[in-house]
């Protein structure tokens, strides 16, 4: 028994868009294997199942889960000229999935965020509020960098008045 999931994208290709299965507190003996397959693979499997509804599929996985290791967010900022205690955050995340090099998910968001500070410096613009860039670690595996950032900000009584994380690649923004 297992589950096969069609890749969650609209392109027809042979690259599965990976994700993760989270069993939370499900006992080990109740967990079932799960795998994502490419859109082309899903189309082929669907056609085969239509031809033979009793088709049996055998697949073998060799994936592993490694223990977490210490990692860090990367933070840079321009201190506000009038209200340095008010913090505006823009950010992206540093980690990526196994099939990608991270250039879209989420290298583009990191570069976009760093460009905010670079442009302000080039224009010699002095923001009234603190502008902080946060490159979050471990977004893909449980948002751990963001959770840690929020906890530290809370412990330090920081006043965040704005936050924006770019995580849709270097394409036209779809919302704000």
PLM regions with names:
Residues 11-14, 67, 143:
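Short, well-ordered, mixed-charge alpha-helical segments that flank or form enzyme active sites
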Residues 2-6, 34-36, 75-77, 87-91, ...:
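Structural recognition of the beta-strand scaffold that forms the well-ordered cores
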Residues 70-73, 96-176:
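Acidic/histidine-rich catalytic neighborhood of metal-dependent amide-processing enzymes
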Residues 7-9, 49, 94, 137:
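A mature extracytoplasmic/lumenal domain signature
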Residues 10-13, 38, 171:
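Short gly/pro/ser/thr-enriched loop/turn and capping motifs at secondary-structure boundaries
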Residues 21-103, 115-128, 151:
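Soluble metallo-hydrolase cores and metallopeptidase-like ectodomains found primarily
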Residues 4-21:
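BRCT (BRCA1 C-terminal) domain core and associated BRCT-interaction motifs
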Residues 17-23, 143-148:
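Charged, often glycine-rich, active-site loop that binds/positions anionic groups
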